[in-house]
Each structure stands twice: as C-alpha cells, then as structure tokens.
Amino acid sequence: LGVSAKTQHNEVAPAQHELAPIYAQCNIATDNNQLMMEVMKKVAYRHGLVCLLHEKPFAGVNGSGKHNNWSITTDDGINMLDPGKTPHENFQFLLVLGAIMRAVDKHADLLRESASDVGNDHRLGANEAPPAIISMFLGEQLEDVVMQLIDKGDATSSIQKGKLKTGASTLPDLNKDATDRNRTSPFAFTGNKFEFRMVCLLYTSPSPRDAH
C-alpha cells in the first residue's frame, strides 16, 4: 500500500492496538489515514473479527482517538516550528509560536467543535484521554521564554536540556527532553511540532485543520 508505520503496539484496553503512520504532507497523510482505516476493517472481517473504529466502545476503559501532528515547513525545507538550541534568539520561531498561541486562544471553540461527536465526548476527560477543555502545553523551556517576553518584553536565556540520572552506576546519564512532554495535553508542543490530541477516531484527519 505504500504506507509506512512508525509504531505498532498494544494499548491499555483489551484488544486495543495503535498504528502510527510516519509523518507526511497533509494530503498524503490524509489519504494514508483513510486507507489504513478501510484496510483494517476489511482484514478484520476476513478473519471473522470486527475492527471497532469508535472513540468509546466500552465504558470504564480507555477509548481510542488520533493525534493530529501540526507542522509548518517552507518550500525549501525550513521547519518553522524548530526552536533550535536557543529559542529565545530564534525570532522566526517565536513569531510563528506566538501566532499559533493566539489562534488557539481565539478559536478554541472551533477546535473543540472539530473534535466533538457522541463517542468522543464520552472519551475525553478520563482514562488517559485529553481533557475536554482546550489548553496548550509548551514545556518548561518554551514556557520560560514566553514568560520572559510577557514579564520583561525581552527573552535573554533558554533553559537547556538536563541529564536524567537513573541512580544505577552501570547505566549512563540520559538527556532529558527540553519540551517536557505532557501526554494528556489537548494541544502540546513536542520538539518541533504541535500535537492536537482530541481528534475523533472516525473523523478524517484534516477536519481539525479545516476548522482552524
């Protein structure tokens, strides 16, 4: 089919699985997503099973949704959401970040509406799903830069990645993620992109983008 997957693993709920295709341009990623859902249903049926593409088929256990990755890249390959090692000095990135923050704040109602249906409204707010209220999570590093801009009108420093010490002498220290990933934030910055995590499982992938 030509659809490359990044991960495929079991999830929390019984007989629940995750399949994550590799990032692609919006139109290609959308086609891949629709193709995957259709093929999964057909293959399950051939084996006497049913592939439930429903946000909350069973009460009391984790439901299912999608992560919609938002990135902006120029025609010559520059990622507008790459903060670099010193985000406080990356004025292009800060401009794009500020525009997205303003857009999410101004149009939170449209984003929420784009993720609303009967099944998804039962999923949100419990069992590791994002809350039903739109909020953004930038991580410790970017939050500090933004607060410097708000408080002083200028940002002069960026928190750098720290080391994770395991306490085991046989294991090396590991680099910590400066974005401080939050698994349940509805709209979170994850390294060099945003993830919108409230998307309905059955909806076509561009729906939240169209709403925005």
Regions found by a protein language model. Name each.
Residues 203-212:
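Single conserved hydrophobic/aromatic residue that forms the stacking wall/gate
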Residues 1, 12-13, 17-38, 42-47, ...:
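Loop-rich catalytic cores of soluble enzymes, especially ATP-dependent carboxylate-amine ligases
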Residues 3-5:
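Well-ordered beta-sheet/strand-loop patches within structured domains
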